[in-house]
Every structure is written in structure tokens, then in C-alpha cells.
Swiss-Prot record:
Cofactor: pyridoxal 5'-phosphate
Underlying gene: bioA
Subunit organization: Homodimer.
Family: Belongs to the class-III pyridoxal-phosphate-dependent aminotransferase family. BioA subfamily.
Keyword NADP carried by entry: no
Keywords: Aminotransferase, Biotin biosynthesis, Cytoplasm, Pyridoxal phosphate, S-adenosyl-L-methionine, Transferase
Assigned GO CC terms: cytoplasm
This protein's record includes keyword Transmembrane helix: no
GO terms for biological process, alphabetical: biotin biosynthetic process
Organism encoding this protein: Citrobacter freundii
UniProt-recorded name of the protein: Adenosylmethionine-8-amino-7-oxononanoate aminotransferase
Amino acid sequence: MTTDD
């Protein structure tokens, strides 16, 4: 899982 803000 990847999270980009």
C-alpha cells in the first residue's frame, strides 16, 4: 500500500 499526500 502506498500513501501520497
